[in-house]
């Protein structure tokens, strides 16, 4: 995906921004890019990843949108599914990851739900904070197992803040980020892209 240069008016004067973003990502720092809709945020990220590829860096990039997210738990499920799809592609592989990394949680891989609804993460009970943190730790664990830097782009992340339990999810994410940083695990990071668009406008 990130193998061609992108040019356009939005990149005039953005050389410094590209350099700063590239430096942050090379250190596996989490990044927030907050600008109005249509100002070239994704293209900026695209260019940085392209340069990283040209420079010989090996990494994986996943992407998800939070535009239609109205519940924090739905956000976590979508994030978990996006992370799993980044490293697996078959039902057996999906089930293997859920069994290995989410054992002891209320998350399961339901083959019927996957077949009927393309759902990777189903639940067998109400979710608690430990369940959610297990999924939030998943991208770090999978990246470490593969030994490859991994980035997850979350587009329109501001919608999580509008969700009823959004603050809870943000706090859990911060806890996990602090924990993995303390463990010295610097192989995964988020790129949060935000604008003024939100699901409540639908």
Q: Where are the language model's segments positioned?
A:
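A short, basic N-terminal segment
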Residues: 1-34, 54-55, 198
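Small/polar loops that bind or transfer phosphate-bearing groups
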Residues: 13, 64, 192
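Alpha-helical elements of the RecA-like P-loop NTPase motor core of helicases
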Residues: 19, 73, 201
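P-loop NTPase nucleotide-binding core
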Residues: 30, 34-151, 160-161, 166, ...
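Sensor-1/coupling segment of RecA-like P-loop NTPase cores
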Residues: 144-146, 150-153, 159-202
């Amino acid at each position: 995906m990130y193998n061609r240069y992108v040019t356009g008016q939005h990149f005039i004067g953005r050389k410094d921004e590209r350099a700063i973003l590239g430096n942050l990502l090379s250190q596996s720092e989490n990044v927030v890019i907050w600008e109005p809709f249509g100002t070239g945020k994704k293209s900026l990220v695209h260019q940085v990843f392209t340069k990283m590829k040209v420079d010989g860096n090996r990494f994986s990039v996943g992407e998800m949108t939070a535009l239609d997210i109205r519940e924090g738990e739905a956000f976590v499920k979508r994030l978990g599914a996006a992370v799993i799809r980044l490293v697996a592609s078959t039902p057996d592989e999906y089930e293997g990851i859920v069994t290995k990394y989410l054992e002891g949680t209320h998350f399961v891989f339901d083959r019927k739900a996957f077949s009927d609804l393309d759902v990777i993460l189903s639940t067998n009970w109400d979710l608690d904070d430990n369940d959610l943190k297990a999924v939030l730790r998943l991208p770090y664990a999978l990246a470490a197992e593969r030994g490859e830097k991994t980035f997850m782009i979350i587009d329109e992340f501001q919608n999580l803040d509008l969700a009823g339990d959004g603050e809870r999810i943000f706090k859990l994410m911060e806890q996990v980020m602090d924990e993995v940083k303390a463990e010295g695990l610097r192989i995964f990071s988020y790129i949060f892209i935000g604008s003024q668009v939100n699901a409540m406008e639908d």
